[in-house]
Amino acid sequence: MDPVDPRLEPWKHPGSQPKAACTSCYCKKCCFHCQVCFTTKGLGISYGRKKRRQRRRAPQDSQTHQVSLPKQPASQARGDPTGPKESKKKVERETETDPVD
């Protein structure tokens, strides 16, 4: 290894910076270009501020589209349509007629 001038900062040492500039390309070669490219492109880690995406506003005619949709029927109860009371009575009758012991 060549001797390095001790007065230079570590990030200014020869060979510490790649010869080509960083690009916005995400190909394999560019992802492994330097340590910064690897963390941002390869790993997807960025410590910068995240930009807020603005939500797309609905057009003014959106309420007319809501009216044209068919109404959904009321949700029906699942399971036994007779209800829980009758099913309990059936279980009680079965236990009375078929005693185990």
UniProtKB/Swiss-Prot annotation:
List of residues binding Zn(2+) 1: C22, H33, C34, C37
InterPro entries per UniProt: IV_Tat, Tat_dom_sf
Glycyl lysine isopeptide (Lys-Gly) (interchain with G-Cter in ubiquitin) crosslink residues: K71
Region of interest called Disordered, as start-end residue ranges on this chain: 1-20, 48-101
Residues bearing PTM N6-acetyllysine: K28, K50, K51
Ranges of biased composition (kind: Basic residues): 48-57
Region (Core): 38-48
Motif Cell attachment site, residue range(s) on this chain: 78-80
Changes after translation: Asymmetrical arginine methylation by host PRMT6 seems to diminish the transactivation capacity of Tat and affects the interaction with host CCNT1. Acetylation by EP300, CREBBP, GCN5L2/GCN5 and PCAF regulates the transactivation activity of Tat. EP300-mediated acetylation of Lys-50 promotes dissociation of Tat from the TAR RNA through the competitive binding to PCAF's bromodomain. In addition, the non-acetylated Tat's N-terminus can also interact with PCAF. PCAF-mediated acetylation of Lys-28 enhances Tat's binding to CCNT1. Lys-50 is deacetylated by SIRT1.
Ranges of compositional bias, category Basic and acidic residues: 1-12, 83-101
Name this protein carries in UniProt: Protein Tat
Gene assigned in the entry: tat
